[in-house]
Amino acid sequence: MSIRIGYKASAEQFGPRDLVEYAVRAEELGLDSVTVSDHFLPWRHEGGHAPFALAWMAAVGERTNRVLIGTSVLTPTFRYNPAVIAQAFATMGLLYPGRIMLGVGTGEALNEIAVSGREWPEFKERFARLREAVDLIRDLWTKEGVSSDGPFYPTVDASIYDRPETPVKVYVAAGGPLVAKYAGRAGDGFIATSGKGMELYTEKLLPAVKEGAEKAGKTFEDVDRMLEVKVSYDRDPEAALENTRFWAPLSLTPEQKHSVDSATEMERLADELPIEQVAKRWIVASDPEQAVKQFRPYLEAGFNHFVVHGPGHDQERFLTQFTEDVVPLLRKLG
């Protein structure tokens, strides 16, 4: 099995110009993909960022020649109309053929309530919206005069006039087996995040992806299994640990984050966590073999595409050290 290794551009932590340069550097260093988070509000108020992901993708496309570029992830169901997302990604698919992917998820309150003022719906509605949105996006990429009477996104004779011959690939992010099964059935790829206990991946998520793929007449290998790996690698052990602190919000439970609708409140809750709890979500390593040892269980579970998210503020340092020390060892596993 061939391993792909990518870079996660953290739009919650850096401004757009810096993020473009990091993506360019990732390609120069031999990585295979760059993905970007799509936030309207960041995880933190102080020092936080939230540039527009789609503008960033186009800028990266102009500055690179090879890497796959995509969202990890975008919610096409609340502050966006999925028809507009279909148009945007069709355009990028023409500009950068074969290099664009659309990673989607059911969303979180932090990014959607601020622009709607509505109550955050329960999972059942969010998942229904996602399925309808993906169906509509794909219809608009492959058909003309699309009329839909769906409950959330009705269209009347809608057409996208500029679209690539080969539609953009859709990756579905999932944290539970229901959406993972949908990712296997309807997605070209599946996205998960690391650090949540191996049983989740081996007993729930990946088996569900396989089941969904088989129900759609595909094989497990037909679905790109992408894992966003939270890895704080630095040759200095103290720096490797301390670099995780900015990302303390990731260690909050889903229940703690469910209805949080401001970066200030998210930051307050996160800063109450001890560094030891914050670091639990991360592979914290200063030795290459130690880092690879913690990647190996994910590879053995069935993931084939690792997108690394380094938490520190010095991303040039992270990219250089990680690609020099760890990437060659990871490539040997594939």
Swiss-Prot record:
Keyword Oxidoreductase listed: yes
Binding site for coenzyme F420-(gamma-Glu)n: 38, 75, 106-107, 111, 175-176, 178-179
Signal peptide: none
Transmembrane segments: none
Known catalytic reactions: oxidized coenzyme F420-(gamma-L-Glu)(n) + D-glucose 6-phosphate + H(+) = 6-phospho-D-glucono-1,5-lactone + reduced coenzyme F420-(gamma-L-Glu)(n)
EC number: 1.1.98.2
Short name of one Pfam family: Bac_luciferase
Residues annotated as binding substrate: 193, 196, 257, 281
GO molecular function annotation: coenzyme F420 binding; glucose-6-phosphate dehydrogenase (coenzyme F420) activity; oxidoreductase activity, acting on paired donors, with incorporation or reduction of molecular oxygen
Entry's Gene Ontology BP terms: carbohydrate metabolic process
Active-site positions on this chain: 39 (proton donor), 108 (proton acceptor)
Subunit structure: Homodimer.
Family as reported in the entry's similarity comment: Belongs to the F420-dependent glucose-6-phosphate dehydrogenase family.
Name of the molecule in the record: F420-dependent glucose-6-phosphate dehydrogenase
Organism: Kribbella flavida (strain DSM 17836 / JCM 10339 / NBRC 14399)
Highest classification ranks of the organism: Bacteria, Bacillati, Actinomycetota, Actinomycetes, Propionibacteriales
Gene name in the database record: fgd
